[in-house]
Structure formats: structure tokens, C-alpha cells
């Protein structure tokens, strides 16, 4: 996802995400030079034809990332706490982690990774040794939760509060 954080190039898969402010496709050549062999793209460049790499061309790279991580989540039959609300998600997540980690091997969202990109990056970190997941989900537009909820697939839900934060996306 972030070309600056490529540690294991030969074991990495790069999703060339696009947004209003950026286009991940412009980093593909740089990553090829670093040894990355697997890419999910929505814009294929013919110059990549002779590269020793795999390219999966999809309509929407964010949707592909979310789908892949949703399938990854299905591999784990453990309790998962999903936390949402206008405010307080991160502090509630951190409190729960502090209370539960002495008793369970927990995985949690790093920092405030609660967006359509942050949630998949968090859930992707689930491993067989984990006994409990604690993830936060933030929404700022109508129907956004329908993309995030299947990725977290919580067995326990916590709704912190409903306030005016992010309300501009719901008008």
C-alpha cells in the first residue's frame, strides 16, 4: 500500500490505490526496481509486459483489497470486537486492549486505522496465534459501513456515541 514501507519485496503485494489526491500506479516502476513481484492495478501499463512480475487488473483496487482482507478474516474463528461511533473509538479500543491483553493474545487496529483503507490494513494483521480481535471502524459517508463491516465481521459490537462529527457526509 505504501511504497515507502516495502520491507519484504519478494513477499509483498502492492495495491495501486487511487484517490482524489493520489494515484498508486505511479509507484509501480519504483517498486519493480525494489523487487516487488505482485501488483493489483486498475490501470495497466504496456511497459510492464516484459517485467518478471504478476499483475492482477481489477476495476477497483480498493474493493479488491477489501475483498481479499474480508476473505482473510473468514479464516479466523475468534471473538472480534468492532467499535464505532462519532467519537471515542480509539480510546475505547486501547482501554479494551489494556484490560484484555493480559488474558488473551490480542490483535488491534494500530493508531486510528479506522477508514476504508485502515480497516483492511488492520485486519490483514490477524494471525493464527491471535485469540481476540479489537478493531475500530469510522464512517463519514452514507453506506460506508457496508464496505467496512464485512471486513471486521465483529462478533461483539460497541457503539460509542452519535454526535455531529463527520455529519457533512450524511447530508
Each language-model region and where it sits:
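Phosphate-binding loop of NTP-binding sites
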Residues: 63-171
Amino acid at each position: 500500500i505504501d511504497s515507502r514501507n516495502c520491507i519484504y519485496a519478494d513477499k509483498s503485494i502492492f495495491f495501486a490505490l487511487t484517490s482524489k489526491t493520489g494515484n498508486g500506479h505511479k509507484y509501480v516502476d519504483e517498486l519493480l526496481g525494489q523487487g516487488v513481484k505482485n501488483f493489483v492495478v486498475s490501470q495497466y501499463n504496456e511497459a510492464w509486459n516484459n517485467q518478471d512480475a504478476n499483475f492482477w487488473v481489477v476495476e477497483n483496487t480498493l474493493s479488491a483489497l477489501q475483498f481479499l482482507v474480508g476473505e482473510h478474516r473468514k479464516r479466523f474463528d475468534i471473538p472480534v470486537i468492532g467499535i464505532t461511533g462519532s467519537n471515542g473509538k480509539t480510546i475505547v479500543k486501547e482501554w479494551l486492549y489494556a484490560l484484555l491483553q493480559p488474558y488473551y493474545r490480542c490483535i488491534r487496529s494500530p493508531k486510528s486505522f479506522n477508514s476504508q483503507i485502515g480497516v483492511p490494513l488492520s485486519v490483514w494483521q490477524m494471525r493464527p496465534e491471535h485469540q481476540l480481535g479489537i478493531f475500530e471502524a469510522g464512517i463519514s459517508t452514507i453506506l460506508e459501513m457496508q464496505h467496512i463491516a464485512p471486513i471486521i465481521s465483529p462478533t461483539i459490537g460497541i457503539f460509542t456515541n452519535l454526535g455531529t462529527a463527520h455529519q457533512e457526509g450524511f447530508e
